[in-house]
């Protein structure tokens, strides 16, 4: 089974779409999975949406009492994961979920660790591009 860890902060408006898209991509590829949303102390409806999504099965949620940062959310999600393989993806779908399938297949082929990044930074503001380097 694959565990997909999804750190989120104030992303209540997009959670249903995120869960639906990721589950659809993995279902189409016949990959069994669990989704673990980690709410990093959101101030909006994020936790309520995660709780509602969890009722459908295959989705779990973790909730921080305050904002501890994305890295802490990722670590908490990885610690809670039950899968043989884990994948971390942002909750706003800025990265294509189809890459999960590609990387999962590489893992099945014997790779132990994988990572991804943007091939092109696109039209980001100069300060953001500088900070990312």
Predicted regions span which residues?
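Acceptor/aglycone-binding surface of glycosyltransferases and processive sugar-polymer synthases
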Residues: 60-66, 70-80, 85, 94-133
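Acidic helix N-cap motif at the loop->helix transition within catalytic regions
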Residues: 13-17, 43-53
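Cell-envelope/extracellular polymer assembly enzymes that use nucleotide-activated donors
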Residues: 1-3, 34
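Short, well-formed alpha-helical segments that are part of the catalytic scaffolds
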Residues: 11-26
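Short helix-capping segments at alpha-helix termini
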Residues: 26-31, 54-59
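A conserved acidic beta->alpha catalytic loop
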Residues: 39-47, 93-94
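Short beta-strand/loop segment that forms part of the nucleotide-sugar
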Residues: 23, 31-41, 62-63
């Amino acid at each position: 089974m694959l565990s997909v860890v999804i750190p989120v902060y104030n992303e209540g408006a997009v959670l249903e779409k995120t869960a639906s898209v990721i589950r659809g991509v993995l279902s189409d590829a016949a990959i069994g999975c669990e989704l673990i949303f980690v709410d990093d102390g959101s101030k909006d409806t994020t936790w309520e949406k995660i709780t509602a999504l969890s009722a459908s099965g295959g989705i779990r949620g973790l909730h921080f009492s305050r904002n501890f940062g994305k890295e802490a959310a990722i670590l908490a999600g990885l610690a809670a994961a039950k899968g043989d393989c884990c994948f971390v993806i942002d909750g706003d779908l800025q990265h294509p979920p189809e890459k999960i399938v590609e990387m999962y297949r590489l893992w099945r082929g014997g790779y132990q660790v994988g990572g991804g990044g943007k091939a092109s930074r696109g039209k980001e503001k100069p300060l953001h591009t500088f900070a990312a380097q």
